[in-house]
């Protein structure tokens, strides 16, 4: 059996269960990735379409292994707990530090794969034949309001709230489509500070820096948390792989002290840096 076939069989079994037996049968077929809905209109020849379809399927299969790790491994859960434990220690240190008292304290968090877990939705999508988590897919998926809490998230957020620290959810979910569903989902999960002042979604600019700047004008931000370099105020948006890594190196002292990163091998800006136009 080809390795790519094994990836799809294992992923469907572990992520989609018995929902999509038909997808398992078609694991080697190009139909596994629904290219008809994502091939740009500028691609006109059958050869170009076939090449693009093959590239997309390879990327989808590669990301499936990362998603499988997130969905099933004990190590991923351990890293989530570790991230929140480190973050809680940093918050308590900041609360006890008088130098931080000039402004009210705040933390800034990403949403997806930081406080909420979408791996079940992504697994079901792959089992149904889609392995490309682009903007249209995200808007439809999160609109369902079925995101689950990350391990340790509810306890962490409520403890931060009890400490008197403001919580801001800065996400690139699309506000005109996803705001109401996001707020409802977060409230159902038991997250605190879920309102229009604290849930800051993408409206006109996917660069989070303007939202970071607006928060920093009123608050002393003691912690940023996310699964993407763009979740931190370090200017990685639109940068090349080399530039992104250089920026991270320049901020190495901030990780574990002001920044807490969660692992995400399934999707993110690192993918678009590898394959332009594949993922935003």
Task: Annotate each predicted stretch with a short phrase.
Residues 2-5, 12-14, 18-109, 273-280:
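Non-catalytic pre-domain segments flanking phosphatase-related domains
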Residues 69-80, 139-147, 168-175, 200-202:
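Second-shell loop/turn segments in exported
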Residues 95-106, 167-172, 194-198:
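Surface-exposed patches in mature extracellular/periplasmic domains of secreted proteins
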Residues 90-97, 122, 156-166, 185-192, ...:
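Structured segments of extracytoplasmic/periplasmic soluble domains
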Residues 28-33, 38, 42, 74, ...:
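C-terminal cap/substrate-recognition subdomain and adjoining C-terminal extension
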Residues 106-110, 116-117, 166-171, 200, ...:
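Structural recognition of the beta-strand scaffold that forms the well-ordered cores
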Residues 97-104, 115-147:
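Active-site neighborhood of HAD-like aspartate-dependent phosphohydrolases
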Residues 113, 153-186:
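Substrate-recognition element of Asp-dependent hydrolases with the DxDx(T/V) motif
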């Amino acid at each position: 059996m080809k390795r790519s076939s094994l990836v799809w069989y294992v992923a469907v079994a572990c992520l989609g269960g018995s929902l999509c037996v038909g997808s398992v049968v078609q694991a080697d077929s190009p139909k596994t990735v629904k290219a008809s809905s994502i091939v740009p209109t500028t691609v006109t020849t059958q050869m170009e379409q076939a090449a693009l379809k093959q590239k997309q399927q390879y990327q989808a299969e590669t990301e499936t292994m990362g998603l499988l790790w997130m969905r099933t491994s004990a190590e991923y859960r351990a890293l989530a707990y570790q991230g929140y434990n480190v973050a809680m220690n940093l918050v308590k240190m900041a609360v006890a530090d008088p130098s931080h008292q000039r402004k009210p304290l705040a933390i800034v968090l990403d949403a997806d794969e930081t406080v909420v877990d979408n791996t079940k939705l992504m697994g079901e999508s792959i089992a149904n034949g889609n392995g490309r988590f682009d903007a249209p897919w995200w808007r439809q998926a999160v609109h369902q309001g079925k995101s689950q809490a990350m391990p340790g998230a509810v306890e962490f957020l409520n403890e931060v709230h009890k400490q008197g620290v403001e919580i801001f959810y800065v996400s690139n979910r699309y506000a005109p489509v996803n705001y109401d569903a996001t707020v409802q989902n977060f409230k159902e999960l038991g997250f605190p500070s879920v309102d229009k002042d604290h849930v800051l979604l993408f409206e006109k600019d996917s660069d989070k820096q303007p939202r970071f700047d607006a928060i920093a004008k009123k608050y002393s931000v003691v912690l940023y948390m996310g699964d993407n370099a763009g979740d931190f105020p370090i200017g990685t948006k639109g940068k090349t792989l080399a530039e992104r890594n250089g920026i991270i190196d320049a901020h190495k002292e901030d990780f574990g002290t002001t920044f807490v990163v969660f692992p995400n091998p399934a999707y993110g800006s690192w993918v678009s840096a590898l394959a332009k136009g594949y993922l935003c």
